[in-house]
């Protein structure tokens, strides 16, 4: 791509250069022949890797535009123009160092390759044209003309470069899209900076000296400026070609030609009349020959050659860097777009990221160019393979951000990130920790084994459809199940690991019977009239699915990554809005094995101990009592999608059928199931209404129509709901609504179980006629089953014993019809109020054809217990559950009645006291006076207390002041004592040598006496002392002078 751009640039830029090609060919092997460009071209030919231009443009920064010929911003181009201008004004000293032979030396061995050279870039052509122009000036015929042209060209180049610089600044202010005439063909920001530095270091002084030289020699060389003549000179045309706008460089006629021939022919044609026109021009002044000017021009040309060659080499390095970035981003895109390709279910394999080749370790790095991994959110460079946590994300174009959006998603279609092993959606970029992917993998393995062992074929009328056609044979009154354990275990393996349908489990266990609904857009295909459907077969309790929004179809295996249909979101919204009231769609699950599993009614039994049985092992199917039918009925229905074992929604009826055979530990045969005929179902009093309803919609509900497949995400939303009715997931033990799929940690499960126990257990009443359970010794109506603690049983001191007729009441006898109480396990007739210990009930249970109908005594248990208080409808109870309220303890109406009774008792006591004369007027007055006196005395005492408190506070303040004064006095005394001790020691030391008459030497023992004697002597100075005494006093004065008080 870069080679094509260079050829086009060479082709368009070399059209206006007037240089004779015959003279340029000997100079093509100059040392500055752009070796880096040839090396890059050789590497491209060796690699031969095509680069997608669209992807490479997306990966490159915004300022990079290869279709414009690798043009840079106007600022960089201005710097390069300044470089060219600086090169034109070189110093005279450097020009004198380089000779003409050194600059234009050409080896003789390169003459054989003159005609085979190609011009790889425009700077190479510019260098060779300028070099040839220097050689042209050696000839004596045009020596004077060339000297004049050199001086004028330098001045004109300086003026034009200044004009171009000003023009480029104006265009850059207007905008980037405006093209100005100062753009060089190859430049980069790094090149401009380095060239400007080199110009400042090496040629900065030369520009100044050249300007000074031209200024001094201006009067000597007076040339007339003619624009037309300057444009016809080859040197000027070669320099002015850089300033031609890009719009004039593209020629439609020359684009189809060879790049070499297209620029060689106009050069030869235009170069011939150039110098005759210059010689004929009479506007040029004749000056004397000066070799210094020629050498100066040669030095300028050599410096210009070096600058252009350096710029070409750096431009090649710049394009090589972009080429590496293109390859890196192509590899990264190829790695990111390896997503799981899911094929059709007809036998093709599934390719996921697990089977795709693992990328190399060195490629697991940040995709942002120039990012070394520091400052990432993850803090670990090898694990950062996306743009989400990179601090340099703002510098990435929007196209790259759009390409890397899929990295942040789970690759499993329909997965929202819930239930992952690492519980983080952003870090989940593979199928390893996704529960939906694991379920699909299991489904594929089961589907493969299922397709191998399948015995059913496609329906001939629907053979053109892609989806498979299943056949289900519903055999009513068929033979008993006698399949061996090997085949039964093989069938059990197929249906062992399937998702459980909690919605239908709620419908079966908790007694919810929503209306039969079908999904929108589902239409049952009409049945063809046949003998098989003359007597239509109805399925009393088919396997219901989780609802219309969770149809028993998994998404197709060929569903591509990133496809999210609208019905997925609609179904998800329906699943969220329909958590509390789940709709049951009575559809029969289609499989490749003929089967029809029946679900029984919503009877939950409570045994004699009050324990709720949730094992679903009641009403076991005994095939011995079911007579076989003569001709089975077969229904062939087209399935909407290839059926997998994982798409089977297992509800309570399915597990009942599993448990009703021989228990959970025995293999079960799924090949056939048994049902009832219409006559038996119509005789059944419980399921009669349900059968009538299902007669109308049996065909519509049992055959799902071909509907667009729903994602397993909708199925998952239904499965993660709490099975407790009315539970929104709050208050669970686990603290996570999504992980709560059982009743074990639900706070509402206890209330629900209590309500079920109360709904299915017999009402426990007090046997005393007219007793509502209030006032019992135990305080609990439910535990009161005898007359021992009943207050009404001993009313009036009469012992009320139940009569024979009362014992035979329906509440006290066995609920089994025909049982007289004999043979019970408890051995006591009166305490036998359930069918658990009745031998007749066990016998009838064994003989009963298990058709899903409850026993006769179980029908009597369906009556719900009610509040015993007359007029109470169950509202406002303490436990907020009417079903479990069987006493007056939590009834609000009873509480109001009790309050009224207490108030009436208090009024009665007041009335009795008033009538007894206790509350007389005189006594009340006397008591009032005493109370007044007490109040007055209390006020006086309070006033005295206030006075005492004020006195106490004043005394306390005085005491504090006295204590502070004492502290000050003590401190002054201590200081005085210290000072006295110091003075005494000083006096003793000073008077140690002086001895008073009649006294010994001074010391601490006689210090006071010594001081007293001295005071007496000094106080009686008026007396006449002997000269000895006066001398002694003088000596004492001299000794005491050193003491300072």
From Swiss-Prot:
Q: Where does Zn(2+) 5 bind?
A: 814, 819, 832, 838
Pfam families associated with the record: MYT1 (PF08474), zf-C2HC (PF01530)
User: Keyword Nucleus on this protein?
Assistant: yes
Keywords, A to Z, come to: Coiled coil, DNA-binding, Metal-binding, Nucleus, Repeat, Repressor, Transcription, Transcription regulation, Zinc, Zinc-finger
In residue numbers, the region (Disordered) covers 38-90, 158-228, 340-364
Give the Basic and acidic residues compositional bias ranges: 69-90, 159-177
- Residues recorded as binding Zn(2+) 3, renumbered to this chain, are 722, 727, 740, 746
One GO biological process term is: positive regulation of transcription by RNA polymerase II
The organism's place on the tree of life at top rank: Eukaryota
Chain sites annotated for binding Zn(2+) 4:
766, 771, 784, 790
Q: Of which family is this protein a member?
A: Belongs to the MYT1 family.
Protein name, UniProt field = Suppression of tumorigenicity 18 protein
What organism is the protein native to?
Mus musculus
Q: What is the lineage of its organism?
A: Eukaryota, Metazoa, Chordata, Craniata, Vertebrata
Gene from which the chain derives: St18
């Amino acid at each position: 791509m870069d080679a094509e751009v260079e050829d086009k640039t060479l082709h368009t830029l070399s059209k206006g250069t007037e240089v004779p090609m015959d003279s340029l060919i000997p100079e093509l092997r100059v040392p500055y022949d752009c070796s880096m460009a040839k090396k890059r071209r050789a590497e491209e030919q060796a690699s031969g890797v095509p680069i997608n231009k669209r992807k490479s443009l997306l990966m490159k920064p915004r300022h990079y535009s290869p279709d414009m010929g690798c043009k840079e911003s106007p600022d960089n181009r201005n710097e390069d123009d300044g470089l060219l201008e600086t090169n034109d004004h070189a110093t005279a000293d450097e020009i004198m160092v380089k000779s003409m032979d050194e600059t234009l030396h050409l080896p003789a061995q390169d003459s054989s390759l003159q005609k085979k050279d190609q011009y790889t870039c425009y700077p190479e052509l510019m260098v060779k044209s300028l070099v040839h122009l220097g050689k042209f000036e050696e000839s004596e015929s045009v020596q004077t003309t060339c000297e004049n042209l050199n001086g004028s060209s330098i001045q004109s180049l300086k003026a034009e470069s200044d004009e171009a610089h000003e023009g480029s600044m104006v265009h850059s202010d207007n905008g980037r899209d405006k093209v100005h005439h100062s753009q060089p063909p190859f430049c980069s920001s790094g090149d401009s900076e380095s060239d400007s530095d080199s110009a400042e270091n090496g040629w900065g002084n030369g520009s100044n000296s050249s300007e000074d030289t031209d200024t001094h020699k201006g009067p000597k060389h007076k040339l007339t400026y003619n624009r037309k003549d300057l444009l016809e000179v080859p040197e000027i045309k070669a320099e002015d070609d850089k300033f031609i706008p890009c719009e004039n460089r593209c020629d439609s006629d020359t684009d189809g030609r060879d790049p070499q021939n297209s620029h060689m022919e106009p050069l030869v044609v235009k170069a011939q009349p150039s110098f005759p026109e210059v010689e004929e021009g009479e506007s040029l002044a004749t000056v004397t020959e000066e070799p210094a000017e020629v050498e100066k021009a040669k030095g300028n040309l050599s410096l210009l050659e070096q600058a252009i060659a350096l710029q070409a080499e750096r431009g090649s390095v710049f394009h090589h860097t972009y080429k590496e970035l293109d390859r890196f981003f192509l590899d990264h895109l190829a790695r990111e777009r390896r997503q799981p390709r899911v094929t059709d279910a007809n036998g093709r394999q599934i390719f996921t990221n697990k089977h795709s080749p693992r990328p190399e370790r060195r490629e697991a790095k940040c995709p942002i160019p120039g990012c070394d991994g520091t400052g990432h959110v993850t803090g670990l460079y090898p694990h950062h393979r996306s743009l989400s946590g990179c601090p340099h994300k703002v510098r990435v174009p929007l196209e790259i951000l759009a390409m890397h959006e899929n990295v942040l998603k789970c690759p499993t279609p329909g997965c929202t990130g819930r239930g992952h092993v690492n519980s983080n959606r952003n870090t989940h970029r593979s199928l390893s920790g996704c529960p939906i992917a694991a379920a699909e993998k299991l489904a594929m393995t089961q589907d493969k084994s299922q397709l191998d062992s399948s015995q059913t074929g496609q329906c001939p009328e629907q053979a053109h459809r892609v989806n498979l056609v299943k056949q289900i044979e519903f055999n009513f009154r068929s033979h008993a199940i006698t399949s061996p354990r090997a085949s039964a275990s093989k069938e059990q393996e197929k249906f062992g690991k399937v998702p459980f349908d909690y919605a239908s489990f709620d419908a079966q266990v908790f007694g919810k019977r929503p209306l039969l609904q079908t999904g929108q857009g589902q239409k049952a295909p009409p049945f063809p009239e046949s003998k098989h459907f003359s007597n239509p077969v109805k399925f009393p309790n088919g396997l219901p699915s989780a609802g219309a929004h969770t149809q028993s179809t998994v998404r197709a295996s060929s569903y591509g990554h990133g496809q999210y249909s609208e019905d997925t979101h609609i179904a998800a919204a329906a699943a969220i809005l329909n958590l509390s009231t789940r709709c049951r769609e009575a559809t029969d699950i289609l499989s490749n094995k003929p089967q029809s599993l029946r679900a029984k009614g919503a009877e939950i039994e409570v045994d004699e101990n009050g324990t709720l049985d949730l094992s679903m092992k009641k009403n076991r199917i005994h095939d011995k009592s079911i007579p076989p039918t003569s001709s089975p009925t077969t229904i062939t229905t087209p399935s909407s999608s290839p059926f997998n074992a994982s798409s089977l929604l297992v509800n309570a009826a399915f597990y009942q059928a599993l448990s009703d055979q021989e228990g959970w530990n025995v293999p079960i045969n799924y090949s056939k199931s048994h049902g009832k005929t219409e006559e038996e179902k119509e005789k059944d009093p419980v399921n009669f209404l349900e059968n009538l309803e299902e007669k109308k919609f049996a065909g519509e509900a049992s055959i799902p129509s071909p509907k667009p497949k729903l994602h397993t995400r909708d199925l998952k939303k239904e499965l993660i709901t709490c099975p407790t009715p009315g539970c929104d997931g709050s208050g669970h033990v686990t603290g996570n609504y999504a992980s709560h799929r059982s009743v074990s940690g639900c706070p509402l499960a206890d209330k629900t179980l209590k309500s079920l126990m109360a709904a299915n257990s017999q009402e426990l009443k007090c046997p005393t006629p007219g007793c509502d359970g209030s006032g019992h010794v135990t305080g609990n109506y439910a535990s009161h089953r005898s007359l021992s603690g009943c207050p009404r049983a001993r009313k009036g001191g009469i012992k009320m014993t139940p009569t024979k007729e009362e014992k035979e009441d329906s509440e006290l006898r066995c609920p089994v019809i025909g049982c007289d109480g004999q043979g019970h396990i408890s051995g006591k007739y009166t305490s036998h109020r359930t069918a658990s210990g009745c031998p007749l009930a066990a016998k009838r249970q064994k003989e009963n054809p298990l058709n899903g109908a409850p026993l006769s005594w179980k029908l009597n248990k369906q009556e719900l217990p009610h509040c015993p208080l007359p007029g109470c409808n169950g509202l406002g109870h303490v436990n907020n559950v009417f079903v479990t309220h069987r006493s007056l303890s939590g009834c609000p109406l009873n509480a109001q009645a009790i309050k009224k009774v207490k108030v009436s008792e208090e009024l009665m006591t007041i009335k009795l006291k008033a009538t007894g004369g206790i509350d007389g007027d005189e006594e009340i007055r006397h008591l009032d006076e005493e109370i007044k006196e007490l109040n007055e005395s209390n006020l006086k005492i309070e006033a005295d207390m206030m006075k005492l408190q004020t006195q106490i506070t004043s005394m306390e303040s005085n005491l504090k002041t006295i204590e502070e004064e004492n502290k000050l006095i003590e401190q002054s005394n201590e200081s005085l004592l210290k000072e006295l001790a110091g003075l005494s020691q000083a006096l003793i030391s000073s008077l140690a040598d002086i001895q008073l008459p009649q006294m010994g030497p001074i010391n601490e023992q006689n210090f006071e006496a010594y001081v007293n004697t001295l005071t007496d002597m000094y106080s009686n100075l008026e007396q006449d002392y002997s000269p000895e005494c006066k001398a002694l006093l003088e000596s004492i004065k001299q000794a005491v002078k050193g003491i300072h008080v």
